[in-house]
Amino acid sequence: MLINLDFETRSKVDIKDKGLDAYAKDISTEVICMAYSIDGGEVKLWTPQFAIPQFLFNPEARFSAWNAAFEYNILRNVLEVPVRHDQFIDSMAMAAANNLPQSLDDCAQVLDAEFKKDPIGKRLIQKLSKPKKDGTFNKDPDLLDQMYEYCKQDVRVEMSIARQIRALSSNEQSVWVLTQKINESGVPVDPDELKNAVFLCENNKTAINREIVELTGGYTANQPAKLIEWLSSRNVIVDDLTAETVTKMLQRSNLTDEVKRVLELRQQGSMTSVAKYEKMLEVQVAGRIRNTLVYHGASTGRFASRGGLNLQNIARPSLGDAEIEEANERILVRGEGGTMEELSSLVRSAIKAPDGFTFIDADLSSIENRVASWIAGQNDKVELFRQGLDEYKAFASSALYNVPYEEVTKDMRQISKSAVLGCMFGQGAKGLVEYADGMGVKMTMGESEKAVKAYRHAYAKVKSAWYDFEGAAIAAIQNEGHPY
C-alpha cells in the first residue's frame, strides 16, 4: 500500500524560528487536515473531527510526501502514529537527487507537471496556520474549505512530480533513511551552558555599546552608517564596516587611539558567530538540536545543514586548544566572565555529550578530492593519499608557498584546502575568492589567481575530466537511453 499524503497544521510556534522538532512537539500544534491518495487513487481528505484512519497504523504501508520529514514528525508527535523512517519516500529528496528544485511549486513549474501548486496557499497559511493577536486561531469555514482543497492539490502535485522523475536507488534510499535517523537522534547541548553564554554575550554587548557611545557621542556598534560618518569626521574614509574591512583597517599604523578603539569595539560587537548560542537555545528541545542535516542539500550531492541552524558552518576558533579548554570551564560551565573572542571560539564547544558519554567527531578525510582524483585518473594525487599524506598540506607546500611539507602552518593548510576544493569544480579566480569567503578564509584576487593556475597545472587530468563529464552529460540528454 502506497499512501501519498500532505498535512496542513497550525501552531503558536513559528517553525522557521524554532525548527521542526519544537514545532511538532509543542502542545499548541494541531492538524487542520490531511489529504491523501491510496495506491494512486482519488485524493481524499481527513480532518481531526473523525477518528484517525487505521491505514496509517499499517506497518507495511509506504508513505510518499514532499519533505517527508514534516509528515513523519506530525504523524509521530501530533497524531502519535508509530510510523518508521523506512516507511517513507521523500519526493523532495528525489527531486534534489535529480538536480531539480527543492520547492514543490518550482519543481512542478520546471517539469511542467500535470498539476501545479495553488498560489492561494501562502495567504491561507498566514490566516489559518498562525495565531491571531489574542492567541486563538481563525476557524472561518470558508477559508478552511479553501485550505482543504489547497491541501488536496498539493498531493496531486506531489504525485505528478513523483511519476515524472527517477526514484532514489536502494542505496540512496537507505542513506536518506539514515539521515532521518541521525536527525531524530539530534545533537546534544547543555541548555544551562547555552544560557550562560547568551547572558555573557548580552553583558559584553551592553559594555561594548556603553563604551562606543561615549567615544562617538551616541552611536552603537550596530549602527555602521553612523559610525562611517563618525570615522569620516576623523579623516578615516571607508565604504563599509564589514568584518573584513575592519580587520584590514586595524592593521593601519596611522590610526589614533580613539579611532582604533572604536574599530575594535565594532569588531567585537558585530561578531555574528555568537548569535548561534541564541539560536541553539531557541531550537533545542530537552538538550537536543534535531533536523539540521539535509540529504542531498548541495548541488554536488553532499549534505547541507539547515533548519534554522547551520551546524556545518561554525566559525573556526581563534583560540588554541588549551585556551579553549580553560575558557570552556570558566565561561560555559561556571558562567563567569569572558570576552567576545572567547565566546566566539567556544561555539563548537557548546555541542557536547551528556555525562557518561563520549562525543566523537568523525569525518571522511578529503573525500571529494580523493574521488575526483581517482575518477579523473590523477594517479600521482591518489598515491599521496595511499601514503597517508595530507594533500592540502602537499598542495600548500609545492604549489602555493614553496615551503617544506613539515613547515606548512594551520592557516596555510586552510587556504590550500579552500583552493583545492573550490578549484576542483572549475572555479575561476573571482569564484574562488567567494568560495573561500564562504569557508571563512580570506583570499586576495592575486592569491586566488595564483591558486587557480597552480591547481590546473597540478591537477591537469581533473581539469580535462570537467569537459569530458560536460560532454557526456550533454550527449546523454540528447540521446536518451544510451550511457556515456
Regions found by a protein language model. Name each.
Residues 87-90, 172-177, 409-419:
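Alpha-helical scaffolds flanking conserved acidic
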Residues 69-81, 98, 228-235, 365-379, ...:
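Short active-site loop/helix that positions an aromatic residue
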Residues 19-22, 361, 368-403:
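Metal-dependent catalytic core segments for phosphate chemistry
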